[in-house]
């Protein structure tokens, strides 16, 4: 089991637009492809921060799902073109994590 903690920086004034877009378009699309989204959050004080966690059974599953999502025509033509206006892609931070034995989320 592995997890991705994904942290994004919104472009100024775009947080609400990003949250609407990811919840209406990105998360449903990715979950339909088989990705498991654990949750998503916005910063309480840091209003430009968006964080979400995805879970994968294995590295092989992660690689397969990345290919199915990011190489799809839907992603390339409908999703990706909108992302640039909402988040600063150069500041995306992805931390890969493994649960500890006592973790409530495994």
For each feature predicted by the language model, list its residue ranges:
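Generic "edge-of-domain/loop-turn" microfeature
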Residues: 15, 47, 61, 99-102
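Accessory recognition modules or surfaces
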Residues: 7-8, 43, 48-61
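Short structural boundary motif marking the start of a folded domain
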Residues: 1-4
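Non-catalytic surface loops within mature trypsin-like serine protease
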Residues: 10-12, 58, 96-99
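Short, surface-exposed ligand-recognition loops at beta-strand->loop->(often short) alpha-helix junctions
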Residues: 9-19
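An amphipathic, aromatic/His-enriched active-site/gating alpha helix that lines ligand/cofactor pockets
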Residues: 17-39, 55-95
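Acidic/histidine-enriched, glycine/proline-rich intrinsically disordered or flexible terminal extensions
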Residues: 89-91, 97-106
